[in-house]
Regions:
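Short basic helix-loop element that most often maps to the first helix and adjoining turn
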Residues: 35-52
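Recognition helix of helix-turn-helix/homeodomain-like DNA-binding domains
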Residues: 56-72
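DNA major-groove recognition helix of helix-turn-helix/homeodomain DNA-binding modules
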Residues: 75-90, 96
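A short glycine-rich, His/Asp/Glu-containing loop-to-beta-strand
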Residues: 118-160, 167, 217-218
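A short hydrophobic beta-strand segment most commonly corresponding to one strand
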Residues: 145-149, 195, 200, 208-225
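Glycine- and acidic-residue-biased ligand/ion/polar-headgroup-sensing regions
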Residues: 164-182
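Short beta-strand His + acidic residue motifs that chelate non-heme Fe in jelly-roll/DSBH
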Residues: 179-180, 187, 202-208
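Short acidic-glycine-tyrosine-enriched beta hairpin
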Residues: 182-199
């Protein structure tokens, strides 16, 4: 099991703000995510302390997320999804299950054709950086395809535990992305792509003056994560 990470250098400074929590941008979605997290923990018969040890996220923060009173940052989502052996997309997609199958909602004719309308697509925004994720594939599709928008001057870091998947490819659509993998920086411009290798801590950084938009493709393995 991993130790709770909250006291190491720059990462600790970032996590200290993350652990303080943020008010949810969308209370309904936040409650669904909290319910999803609690259900996953219950399925594994984990206490709050056990999940905290597995993920490196404090018990207090996990409790706030489960109760729907705090919105986790991208870093915290990466740690939680890694603890459960899920991609971030799988963790977030699960938070919409109740919404998607609510009996009170009329059937969507696009469902039968596999069409996803941009106007009605789900998305998740990191309350700490404004980093925004939109799933481009369904939960049933054999790979995770996600569009990410990273604002200028912002950075998001995921721990190595969030990268124990089969294959992971990043393709930059607009702007420039500074990718730091295991301490090694690489700059990607529009049209560039990179495939990640062995699990390592990864920082996505936008040092430019405009938003960076990129697509992440994850092929799920036995313990696929993102």
């Amino acid at each position: 099991m991993s130790q709770i990470v909250d006291d190491a250098g720059a990462e600790a400074e970032h996590d200290a703000g993350a652990e303080a929590g943020h008010e949810p941008a969308d209370a309904a979605d936040q409650r669904r995510l909290g319910a999803r997290l609690h259900a996953l923990r219950d399925d594994r018969r984990w206490s709050l302390t056990e999940l905290a040890e597995e993920s490196g996220v404090s018990r207090a923060m996990i409790n706030r997320v489960e109760r729907g009173v705090s919105s986790p940052t991208a870093t915290i989502l990466g740690r939680l999804s890694g603890a459960f052996g899920l991609t971030i997309s799988q963790l977030l997609d699960g938070s919409h299950e109740t919404h998607a199958h609510a009996e009170t909602e009329p059937a969507d004719p696009d469902d039968a054709t596999g069409v996803q309308r941009a106007a009605t697509a789900d998305h998740w925004t990191d309350p700490d950086t404004g980093y925004r994720r939109r799933p481009l594939s369904s939960a049933e599709f054999p790979v995770d395809v996600t569009e990410v928008r990273l604002p200028a001057g912002r950075a998001v870091t995921y721990p190595a535990s969030a990268y124990a998947f089969l294959r992971h490819c990043i393709w930059v659509v607009d702007g420039a992305l500074e990718l730091v993998v295991g301490g090694v920086p690489t700059t990607l411009g529009a049209g560039d792509r990179i495939e990640l290798g062995d699990p390592a801590k990864v920082t996505y950084r936008n040092d430019g003056e405009t938003e960076c938009r990129y697509v992440v493709v994850v092929a799920r393995g036995a313990r696929g994560r993102e």
